[in-house]
Amino acid sequence: MEAPAAHDCRNPQFSELSRFWELEPGTDCGTFGIRGYKPISLSWIGSDSVNTLPSSPAPNHTATDPVAYTTNEARIQLSVRTKIAQGLLTHLETARRDSLWFGYTQQSNWQLFNGDISRPFRTTDHSPEITYIYPLDAELPGGWRLRYGGLTLVHQSNGQSEPLSRSWNRTIVSAGLATGNDYVIKGELWNRLFEGEGNDDNPDISDSVGRAEITGLWNIDRKYTLGVVLCFSL
């Protein structure tokens, strides 16, 4: 078998996790190139209720005029990242490479089917982040291998002013496990950064969105992946 070509983050001879985070020199595609990050999607969302009058325990953060939103809407998510540095702590190693990334994710809920109020965007959330990834290769039971550990600082905001302003900051500790290219498990545990009572838009947001997340992926083949995401309010 020929050795994997250098500088190719799409080379199938490397594992999916190694290519995604460019954990080895052979998976390196350089810095400041645009990569995909979280799923880029257009989906239909339905529920049995919708929040027409957003409120928060924070003072002056409760809407006064309800909006006639409907329970069916479209959701659009865009997400990209770029590697801004590499080899920070592994510059003397030849088999693995750490990296620093900047990512941006935008998710919009669009009242596409609500012609009565001119189909507005109900909300758009912006999430810039900085992530450091350190490559690992520890054997685990059942043929699993611990492939990386990570630390992320992320800000999330809806970009609005009071009383609808909602934002928070958190640090995330993450890790990724894999069995070859077939199955991947990614875990995240986060801690919200304290903002002070006068600046906190969402005092109880952790009770709603959780404090940890586990993602399981089955790579059916090179084109298709089946995944499930579990969130926990610890």
Name each model feature, range by range.
Residues 70-78, 83-85:
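Long, low-hydrophobicity, solvent-exposed regions enriched in small/turn-prone and acidic residues
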Residues 54-63, 70, 87-222, 229-232:
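Outer-membrane pore/translocation modules
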Residues 36-58:
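Acidic/polar low-complexity segments with low predicted structural confidence
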